[in-house]
Swiss-Prot record:
It comes from Marinomonas sp. (strain MWYL1). The gene is gatB. Heterotrimer of A, B and C subunits. Its EC number is 6.3.5.-. Belongs to the GatB/GatE family. GatB subfamily. InterPro entries: Asn/Gln-tRNA_amidoTrfase_suB/E, Asn/Gln-tRNA_Trfase_suB/E_cat, Asn/Gln_amidotransferase, Asn/Gln_tRNA_amidoTrase-B-like, GatB, GatB_C_1, GatB_Yqey_C_2, Gln-tRNA_amidoTrfase_suB_CS. The keyword Nucleotide-binding applies. GO terms for biological process: glutaminyl-tRNAGln biosynthesis via transamidation; translation. It comes from the Bacteria. Keywords: ATP-binding, Ligase, Nucleotide-binding, Protein biosynthesis. One of its GO terms (molecular function) is glutaminyl-tRNA synthase (glutamine-hydrolyzing) activity. Transmembrane segments: none annotated. This is Aspartyl/glutamyl-tRNA(Asn/Gln) amidotransferase subunit B. Pfam families: GatB_N, GatB_Yqey.
Length: 481
């Protein structure tokens, strides 16, 4: 059977506010359990919530960034369910009247095509606490530090048709929220988590199949692997004549499998109703317009500028603008060397290679943008060639000093004196007279192949320091005799 995968994603982004959504408690990762709570977070009777206006501003910013309708009147609702880390017995969320309505994103895929993913809504809600199962014998600890932390839940339409497309969409959301400064995007710390709703249907069928939901996947790689794993599981069941059970599942990265957690609830099971402790949030057009006017440059806008200002390819511009930190690094380095293509090649090449090897973010690069740009200047002005520059960059990475200091200490400057290069070439031609005669007797096509031997001899004699841009034309001229 030829199956079509149907995917919708719910992305939970933790907003970078200083305090919680409905209390004055601080928001922070890694504090001692239950040290960042108030009576509101603990669900104590009579403790009333106070809405965080900064979270509202951030939600409206995001709405503008995804071309969405802004809910001029939004309502908080109680989502009722029981769980040990939810002391109130309900989660304050939004249902019928979210702060952000329908929007969309045009997602660039690896093959250069664009896919439009509709966004159903983005609503504000409070996070729950956290159950701690380690270090407790036969018991579960409850940490309510996370309780009432502001979340913006971004719900897509079921428009996604592959794991690659899903990851590209999540990366784009990640890029937008970090550019806006409304979320730090740290998936390892839970600042951004993804729920995957997935079903299969025969190719050409309009009706959706029965979906499962994979909860709280917290890395791009795991999102892709979880989708592939669940597609395979569902396809095996359907092809054996079985049926898919609507349920919530968990992805286990160590075993690379999804496993059942509980039956999947519908909205009716949560008995949503308007929260009596919070008034409807009513916005003015002036408020909405003022926020739109203060939006920073977004990833798609930055990519377009990189193409127009720096004549970069669409691919290079999209890669460099995919993260705000990488875009900033590129621009700072390019301000030093003033050669966008050279800077782009080195940021996406050597810098990215070492960052990946060391599993570092670009913000934690041992070589900052200024120093990186200074290295590129030495390539541009022919002080060193590209091959030597890689060795210098590695030395800079290892903390041996600046580019200039390393070049000087190791005697790596290129030979750019044409007289010295001519003398070096003459010595090599004298020592290889037979090869010179063969070269001069050969036709043009064969000469192009043979000249590499002489270039290699020059580079060997100069210990790689001869400037190739000077060697090649001088050598060609002297070989003619």
């Amino acid at each position: 059977m030829n199956w079509e995968v149907v995917i919708g994603l719910e992305i939970h982004t933790q907003l970078s506010t200083k305090s919680k959504l409905f209390s004055g408690a601080a928001v922070g990762f890694g504090a001692e359990p239950n040290t960042q709570t108030t009576l509101v977070d603990l669900g104590m009777p009579g403790a009333l919530p106070v809405f965080n206006k900064e979270a509202l501003r951030m939600a409206v910013m995001f709405g503008h960034a995804i071309n969405a309708e802004i809910g001029m009147t939004s309502v908080f609702a109680r989502k009722n369910y029981f769980y040990p880390d939810l002391p109130k017995g309900y989660q304050t969320s939004q249902m019928d009247h979210p702060i952000v309505g329908k929007g969309y994103l045009d997602v660039m895929l690896d093959d250069g095509t664009t896919s439009r993913v509709g966004i159903t809504r983005a609503h504000l809600e409070e996070d729950a606490g956290k159950s701690l199962h380690e270090d407790f014998q036969g018991m579960t600890g409850i940490d309510l530090n996370r309780s009432s932390t502001p979340l913006l839940e971004i719900v897509s339409e079921p428009d996604i048709r592959s794991a690659k497309e899903a990851v590209a969409y999540v990366k784009m959301i990640h890029s937008i929220v970090t550019y806006l400064g409304i979320c730090d995007g740290n998936m390892a710390e839970g600042s951004m988590r993804c729920d995957i709703n997935l079903s299969l249907r025969p190719k050409g069928q309009k009706e959706y199949g029965t979906r499962t939901e994979i909860k709280n996947v917290n890395s791009f790689r795991f999102i892709e692997k979880a989708i592939y794993t669940e597609i395979e599981r569902q396809a095996d069941i359907l092809e054996d004549g079985g049926r898919i059970i609507q349920e919530t599942r968990l992805y286990d990265p160590e075993k690379n499998e999804t496993r059942s957690m509980r039956s999947k609830e519908d909205a009716n099971d949560y008995r949503y109703f308007p929260c009596p402790d919070l008034l409807p949030v009513v916005l003015t057009q002036e408020y909405v317009d003022n926020i739109k006017a203060t939006l920073p440059e977004l990833p798609s806008q930055k990519a377009a500028r990189f193409q127009s200002e720096h004549a970069l390819s669409e691919y290079d511009a999209n890669v460099l603008s995919s993260s705000r930190a990488m875009a900033d690094f590129f621009e700072k380095a390019n301000n030093v060397v003033k050669d966008p293509k050279l800077t782009a090649n080195w940021v996406m090449g050597e810098l990215s290679k070492l960052l990946n090897q060391e599993q570092l973010d670009i913000e934690n690069s041992p070589v900052n943008a200024q120093a990186f740009g200074e290295l590129l200047v030495r390539i541009k002005d022919n002080t060193i060639n590209g091959k030597t520059a890689k060795d210098v960059f590695q030395a800079m990475w290892d903390g041996e000093g600046s580019a200039d200091a390393i070049i000087e200490a190791k005697g790596l400057k290129q030979v750019t004196d044409t007289g010295a290069i001519e003398a070096m070439i003459q010595t090599i031609l004298d020592a290889n007279a037979a090869q010179v005669e063969q070269y001069r007797a050969a036709d043009e096509d064969k000469q192009k192949k043979m000249i590499g031997f002489f270039v290699g001899q020059v580079m060997k004699a100069s210990q790689g320091k001869a400037n190739p841009g000077l060697v090649n034309p001088i050598l060609a001229k002297m070989l003619k005799g």
